[in-house]
Regions:
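Membrane-embedded alpha-helical bundles of multi-pass transporters/translocases
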Residues: 2-15, 23-477
Length: 477
C-alpha cells in the first residue's frame, strides 16, 4: 500500500515522515500555533489585502481602460503585454517562495518583506501611470517595463503575505477565520477603489495627471496598511528541528515536494481560474456599463452591489465551512453564482436585472473568496505528512502564481477579445461584434469558468482527511 492510500494512524509497519517535517508547538503559550488568533491580529492580517487592493485591484479594474481610453494604446498590445508579464511573473513567485523559506530574521521569515517592500510597491504603481508623451513604440516599452516592475514588487509582498497565514496558526478553523478577515477587508478595498478611483481622478483634473495623483494617494494608504500588518502579526509555526531552521531544503527538493502534493496543484489551479474570472468581471464592467448600459457611473453601482453582498455572505462563511467543509461551500457558491448569471441573461440591457443578478452573484462569491486561500494553507500539512518537508513559502508561491497568471490571462483575454470584436477606444459608437465581445467578457466566459471550477472541486477531498493528517503529524512529535 502506498503512502497516499494508507491509513493516517501511525503504526509500526508504516513509513513515517522524516523528523525534519515536525513543527513546534508550545501548548498554552502565546506562541502556540494551535491557539486562537487575537481579534486585532486577525484585523491586522486582513489589512494586508486591503493594502494590496488599493493598488492591485484598482489596476485590475482600470488599467486597460486607462491605457486604451486615456493614453490611446491599442487594446491588443495591452493584452499581449499583460499576458507576457504575468506568465514571467508567475516564475518569480516560485523563486520568491524559495527565498521566503530561506529567510531568517528577528521578524521571522515572511513579515520582514512587508516592511521592506511596502514603499517600493507604492512608488512602482505611480510610475505605471506616468506614461511619457513619446512615440507609440517607446510608450509600449515604458508600459512593459513599469508593469513588470509593479508585478515583481507585488510578488515580493504577496507571497510572504499569503505565507503568513500558515505561520500565524496551524489550526484549520483559525486559518479560515484569518482568510475571512483577509477577503472581507480585500473586498472593502475593492469597494473603495471601484467607487473612488474615477471621481478622485476627475477631482484632480482628469486625464493622466489626475490618475497619477489618485494612485499616489492610494499608494500612501497602502503603505500605511502594510506596515500595520507587519506590526500587528506574529509568526508562531516553526520547524522543530534546529538543523532544518539553519539549513533549508534545497530548491530542487522543494519543487519535487510540490510535485507530489496533488491538493496543492488543485488549489493553485482553482485560484488561477478564480483570478481569470475576477479579472474579466472587474475589467469588463467598465466597458459593459459604458456601452451596454450607457452610463459609466453604473460601474460603481454594479461593483458596490457585488461587493456589499459578498461582504454580507462572508459573515456566514466561517461557521458554514466549519460544518460542511470548504470544498462543499465553494461548490454551492459557484452554483449560486450561475443562478445570478441566469437572472442577468433574461435581459442583458436591463439595469435592474443586471444589478439583481449581481447581488445573487455576490452571495455566491462569498464562500469562494472566504475559502480558497484556506484550501491552499491546508495543503502545507498534507505535503508535510506525505513527504516530511514543510515549505510554506513554496506552497503559497503557488497561490501568488495563480493570482498573477490568472489575472494576466484574464486581462489579456479582455484586450484580445475586445480587439477581435473590433472595439474602438475613445468612447465612440461600437459595432455589434464589439458589443457582443463585451457581453461575452462580462457574462458568457465567466459562466464557463464557474462550471470549470465546480469540476475541479469535485476532486478536492482534503477537508475530510485534514484532521487525521494533523493528528498523525502531532503523534510523531
Amino acid at each position: 500500500m502506498t503512502r497516499e492510500t494508507s491509513t493516517l494512524t501511525t503504526s509500526p509497519t508504516e513509513t513515517s515522515p522524516p523528523e525534519t517535517g515536525k513543527t513546534e508547538t508550545t501548548p498554552g503559550s502565546a506562541h502556540d500555533p494551535a491557539a486562537a488568533v487575537p481579534l486585532m491580529e486577525r484585523i491586522g492580517y486582513g489589512c494586508g489585502d486591503l493594502a494590496s487592493n488599493f493598488i492591485w485591484q484598482a489596476m485590475s479594474i482600470f488599467i486597460v481602460y486607462y491605457y486604451t481610453d486615456v493614453i490611446g494604446v491599442a487594446a491588443g498590445i495591452i493584452g499581449s503585454i499583460m499576458l507576457f508579464s504575468r506568465v514571467f511573473d508567475g516564475v518569480s513567485d516560485i523563486a520568491m517562495g524559495y527565498v521566503i523559506d530561506k529567510t531568517t530574521s528577528r521578524h521571522g521569515k515572511a513579515r520582514p518583506w512587508l516592511l521592506w517592500l511596502a514603499v517600493p510597491f507604492a512608488v512602482s504603481a505611480v510610475l505605471l501611470f506616468a506614461v511619457p508623451d513619446v512615440s507609440p513604440f517607446w510608450q509600449t516599452v515604458y508600459i512593459a517595463v513599469t508593469y513588470n516592475l509593479v508585478c515583481l514588487v507585488y510578488t515580493g509582498l504577496n507571497v510572504p503575505y499569503g505565507t503568513l497565514n500558515s505561520l500565524i496558526t496551524q489550526d484549520q478553523y483559525q486559518r479560515s477565520l484569518l482568510n475571512v478577515f483577509r477577503m472581507s477587508l480585500a473586498l472593502v478595498g475593492v469597494l473603495l477603489v471601484s467607487n473612488l478611483t474615477l471621481p478622485v481622478a476627475t477631482l484632480f483634473g482628469g486625464g493622466q495627471g489626475g490618475w497619477i495623483v489618485t494612485f499616489a494617494i492610494f499608494g500612501a494608504i497602502g503603505t500605511g496598511l502594510f506596515l500595520f500588518t507587519f506590526k500587528s502579526t506574529r509568526e508562531r509555526v516553526q520547524p522543530a528541528d534546529e538543523k532544518r531552521r539553519q539549513a533549508p531544503v534545497p530548491l530542487k527538493q522543494s519543487l519535487r515536494t510540490l510535485g507530489k502534493n496533488r491538493y496543492w496543484a488543485l488549489a493553485t489551479l482553482f485560484i488561477l481560474i478564480t483570478y481569470i474570472f475576477n479579472a474579466l468581471n472587474s475589467g469588463a464592467v467598465v466597458y459593459y456599463a459604458q456601452y451596454l448600459l450607457d452610463d459609466t457611473w453604473l460601474v460603481g453601482v454594479i461593483t458596490t452591489a457585488y461587493i456589499v453582498f459578498i461582504l454580507a455572505g462572508m459573515a456566514f462563511v466561517a461557521p458554514i465551512t466549519k460544518r460542511y467543509g470548504k470544498r462543499n461551500a465553494i461548490i454551492v457558491g459557484e452554483l449560486i453564482t450561475l443562478v445570478g448569471y441566469g437572472v442577468m441573461l433574461i435581459d442583458l440591457g436591463n439595469v435592474y436585472l443586471i444589478v439583481a443578478g449581481t447581488i445573487i452573484r455576490g452571495l455566491g462569491k462569498a464562500p469562494i473568496n472566504g475559502s480558497m486561500f484556506a484550501l491552499l494553507g491546508d495543503t502545507i500539512e498534507y505535503g508535510e505528512w506525505k513527504t516530511g518537508i514543510r515549505n510554506e513559502g513554496m506552497v503559497y508561491s503557488g497561490g501568488s502564481m495563480g493570482i498573477k497568471i490568472g489575472s494576466g490571462l484574464g486581462t489579456a483575454l479582455l484586450g484580445w477579445i475586445l480587439a477581435f470584436g473590433g472595439y474602438v477606444g475613445g468612447g465612440g459608437e461600437q459595432s455589434d461584434t464589439a458589443l457582443f465581445a463585451i457581453q461575452a467578457l462580462f457574462v458568457y466566459l465567466p459562466m464557463g469558468l464557474c462550471a470549470l471550477m465546480i469540476v475541479l472541486m469535485l476532486f478536492y477531498d482534503l477537508d475530510k482527511r485534514y484532521p487525521a493528517i494533523v493528528a498523525d503529524l502531532a503523534a510523531k512529535r
